[in-house]
């Protein structure tokens, strides 16, 4: 799901 991807990015941004 796209929502899950967004959540993961917010929790641990690997950028």
UniProtKB/Swiss-Prot annotation:
Q: Which UniProt keywords apply?
A: Lectin
* GO MF: carbohydrate binding
Name used for this protein in its record? Acidic lectin A3
On modification after translation, the UniProt record reads:
Contains 5-6% carbohydrate.
Q: How does it assemble?
A: Dimer. The subunits show apparent MW heterogeneity (32000-35000 MW), which may result from different carbohydrate content, AA sequence, or polypeptide length.
